[in-house]
């Protein structure tokens, strides 16, 4: 088994991935600055996996902390989640995103190189694809100028890692292009708990259902889609976490840099998600239609054939499963990870 450094491991996707890593027998070190996460999530990770992990509170921009981690732990590979991810905020504060997501990633790989650690799984995004591409999106399609600055930072880091791998054959890098993670651990003890107003659909839906917010804001109902609302490929966070384990196992045995889409291959509109949530959970969700959000595209869903064929990965959970698990998490934890 390997020892894995997980940056951003206290966050939504990172924490679910830590459960998978620990349950598979790996040792885990988490580095997280807790800017959009809670240390309570890591306590629950260890309970659910019945195994301890090491936690370091700090930032990937801090070279000293990174060097200390690599000095004190015999790290075999890194899974890199740490970064800012709000599309709307990235349009308003681009420098903040460039520093955290691009400079932070450079800081991390420099520390990895100093420590002679060359195995990396990078948390990328389907937003790297040129918005002119027609879904289903596959990995051979051109990346292009993403429609928002968040996607731009992911694309730049992908390109940096590709060039790094081409220049130094010691590197083995997986670029996982996520579509839209939703759902929660089946125990109801882990889920998405954003700080402040949610930027993603599902925590907004569940917070309205549990009474924390009055209404859901749906951004745009004039897209050329089945009902005018945006269509996305929603994937269960447990399926996504398992994809990281599959990618890690693949990269531990191979060299080079390669991208994989991580999605179900099916698109659902925002209104379809809301109506399905109401049906599955017998809970009404009030909503308002708002103007389109800058940087959003009408339709985005994956061709996931490469990940299925090469990583031995297969998504297992349906949209109904995702929505049932999301609500199970929220109703058990109406205030998220806080105890009040």
What are these model-derived regions, one by one?
Residues 202-340:
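C-terminal substrate-binding subdomain of Rossmann-fold SDR/epimerase-dehydratase oxidoreductases
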Residues 183-185, 222-223:
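Short, basic/glycine-rich phosphate-binding loops at helix/coil junctions
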Residues 61, 85, 97, 197, ...:
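Glycosyltransferase donor-binding loop in the core domain
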């Amino acid at each position: 088994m390997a020892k894995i450094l997980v940056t951003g491991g206290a966050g939504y996707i990172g924490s679910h991935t830590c459960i998978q890593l620990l349950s598979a027998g790996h040792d885990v070190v988490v580095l997280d600055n807790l800017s959009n996460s809670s240390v309570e999530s890591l306590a629950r990770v260890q309970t659910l996996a019945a195994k301890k992990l090491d936690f370091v509170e700090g930032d990937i921009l801090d070279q000293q902390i990174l060097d200390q981690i690599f000095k004190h732990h015999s790290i075999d590979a890194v899974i890199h989640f740490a970064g800012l991810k709000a599309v709307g905020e990235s349009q308003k504060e681009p420098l903040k995103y460039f520093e955290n997501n691009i400079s932070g990633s450079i800081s991390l790989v420099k520390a990895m190189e100093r420590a002679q650690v060359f195995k990396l799984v990078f948390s990328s995004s389907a937003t790297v694809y040129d918005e002119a591409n027609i879904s289903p999106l596959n990995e051979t399609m051109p990346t292009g100028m993403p429609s928002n600055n968040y996607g731009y930072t992911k694309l730049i880091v992908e390109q940096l890692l590709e060039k790094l791998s081409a220049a130094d054959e010691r590197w083995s890098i997986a670029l996982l292009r996520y579509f839209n993670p939703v759902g929660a651990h089946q125990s109801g003890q882990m889920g998405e708990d954003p700080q402040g107003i949610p930027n993603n659909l599902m925590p907004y839906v569940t917070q309205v259902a549990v009474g924390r917010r009055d209404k859901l804001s749906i951004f745009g109902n004039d897209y050329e889609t089945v009902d005018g609302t945006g269509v996305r490929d929603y994937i269960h966070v447990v399926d996504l976490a398992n994809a990281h384990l599959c990618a890690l196992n693949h990269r531990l045995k191979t060299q080079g840099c390669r991208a994989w889409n991580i999605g179900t291959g099916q698109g659902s509109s925002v209104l379809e998600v809301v109506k399905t949530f109401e049906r599955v959970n017998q809970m009404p969700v009030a909503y308002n239609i708002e103007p389109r959000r800058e940087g959003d595209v009408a339709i985005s869903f994956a061709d996931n054939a490469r990940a299925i064929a090469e990583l031995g990965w297969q998504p297992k959970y349906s949209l109904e499963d995702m929505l049932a698990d999301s609500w199970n998490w929220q109703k058990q934890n109406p205030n998220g990870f806080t105890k009040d």
